[in-house]
Amino acid sequence: MPVLLCACGKQPSQTVELNISHARKRALALFELKADQGAVLLDSLRPDKKGVCRFRVPCDSLRIYLLASSDNEHFLCLTPMPHQDLRISANYDSLVSSATVQPIPATDSLCPSLILLAYQQQIAQAERTIRSYTDTWMENRYQSTQVDSLHEACTRAIDSVMDTLRQEARRLCRQNTANLIPVVVINKAIGNRRVLDLSEPETLAFLLDCTKQMQRLNPQNPHVKRLMFQLARIDSYRKQEEIRLLEQTGEEPQIP
């Protein structure tokens, strides 16, 4: 992941306030995920003795931020609404699984970061579950007298976990076209398993439809523009491949 250093400058801003336990003088880094640059480092802070520190970020548009501990193994993804401050409590060594997110002031209105946190925690739990099934298979594949049955059971269990994630990802994309949650969700994967498989025509069509809705609501947002470009390019390539294969078989192309 490319990382650049960037200063926020003096402009209208909002606050991301952290209350971190077990920080032990270790720093936290806040990145902005840029559509054309990747992760750009905004600031790095050490929580005070009470575990508190505050980042200030621009509040002029929808943006995506990544909060990371010093090992950079797990990123807590945040998508605050403009002018919406956030208060985050978490354990330093388990940012995602232990985090709670609260908009400041408390409000009944949409808080995308809270919605996205729930999905990140669901992903983290799914990773642990899949790892458990994988370990069970690896530890017993040479000992079990019913290898085929064991493999089938583990595969079926993993497929069930992925299917649950897939259904939730589609729901989030469908219900959050006014913010940037779909941009994050579309790229989620567990190992080499993408939650939403862009090679599936139906999935690609669904995501294109969601992105078109996002484009109508946020036509100038760089993340939305880039996502629309990427999905349209994949769709164009797929259609060209279908035409090529049909021409090879002598069939008449019937592509919508």
Regions of interest found by a model, annotated:
Residues 210-256:
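N-proximal helix/coil linker or "cap" segments that precede and/or mark the start of modular domains
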Residues 8-166:
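A non-transmembrane, solvent-exposed segment enriched in polar/low-complexity residues
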Residues 1-8:
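Sec-dependent bacterial lipoprotein signal peptides
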Residues 155-156, 194-203:
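Short coil/turn connectors between adjacent alpha-helices in alpha-solenoid helical repeat scaffolds
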Residues 161-172, 205-214:
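Amphipathic alpha-helices of TPR/Sel1-like and other helical repeat/solenoid scaffolds
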Residues 173, 177, 199-202, 219:
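Structural signature of alpha-solenoid helical repeat scaffolds
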Residues 178-193:
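Amphipathic alpha-helical repeat scaffolds of TPR domains
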Residues 190-197, 239:
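Short coil/turn linking the two alpha-helices of tandem helical-hairpin repeats
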